[in-house]
C-alpha cells in the first residue's frame, strides 16, 4: 500500500513539475543588412516616385519559430530614387521631408507580435525626425533551410504628417491643387536575420 501511494505521489510530482518547466528564452538574431531591403513609394496627384533606403542594423528576437520582438535602424542619408533624380533625393533628405542631416537615422521597435507561424501582425513604435508613433502592419515570417529567419512586410503605410512632414500636404495647404503630395507613403521591408 505504501509503495502504491509513493508511486502515485511521485507520478503527481513529476507531472506537476513538468507543468512549471521554464519556458525557452528567445534567441536574438542579427539582421544581415546586405541581404535585407527597404523600398518606398510616395504618391502625388500627378504620379508617384519610388526608391530604396539602406538598412543600418537590426535584430529579431525569436522563440522557437516565432518572432517575439526586435527592431531595425534605417540610414536616412541613403534615400535613393529609382529614377536617379539627385534633385528629388536631395529634397527628400532636406528639412521639408526627412531632415537627414539633423536626423540621420529612423528606427522601428517591435512591441508586440500577434499570431504565430508564417502570418503575423506586428505592432511597434516608428521614430522619424525624433517623433515616435505607434504603427501596426501584417508580416510574414519564414525559417529558412540555412537557419536564417526572413521577416517580410510587403506594405507598411506611414502617415508622414504624424512626423511633422507637411510639405505639399493638402491637409495643411488646401490651395495646393494638383501639386499635392499624399500624406501616406508606403514601405516594403524584408529582413534576413541570422544567429
Question: In which residue ranges do the predicted regions lie?
Answer:
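Bacterial Sec-dependent N-terminal signal peptides
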Residues: 1-27
Amino acid at each position: 500500500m505504501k509503495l502504491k501511494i509513493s508511486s502515485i505521489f511521485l507520478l503527481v510530482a513529476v507531472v506537476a513539475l513538468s507543468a512549471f518547466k521554464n519556458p525557452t528564452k528567445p534567441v536574438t538574431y542579427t539582421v544581415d543588412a546586405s541581404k535585407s531591403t527597404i523600398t518606398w513609394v510616395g504618391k502625388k496627384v500627378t504620379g508617384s516616385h519610388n526608391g530604396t533606403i539602406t538598412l543600418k542594423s537590426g535584430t529579431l528576437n525569436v522563440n522557437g519559430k516565432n518572432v517575439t520582438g526586435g527592431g531595425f535602424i534605417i540610414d536616412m542619408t541613403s534615400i535613393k530614387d529609382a529614377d536617379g533624380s539627385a534633385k528629388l533625393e536631395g529634397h527628400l533628405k532636406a528639412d521639408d521631408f526627412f531632415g537627414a542631416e539633423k536626423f540621420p537615422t529612423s528606427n522601428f521597435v517591435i512591441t508586440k507580435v500577434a499570431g504565430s507561424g508564417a502570418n503575423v501582425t506586428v505592432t511597434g513604435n516608428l521614430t522619424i525626425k525624433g517623433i515616435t508613433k505607434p504603427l501596426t502592419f501584417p508580416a510574414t515570417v519564414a525559417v529558412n533551410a540555412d537557419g536564417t529567419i526572413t521577416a517580410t512586410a510587403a506594405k507598411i503605410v506611414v502617415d508622414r504628417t504624424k512626423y511633422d512632414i507637411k510639405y505639399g500636404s493638402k491637409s495643411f495647404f488646401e490651395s495646393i491643387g494638383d501639386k499635392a503630395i499624399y500624406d501616406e507613403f508606403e514601405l516594403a521591408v524584408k529582413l534576413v536575420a541570422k544567429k
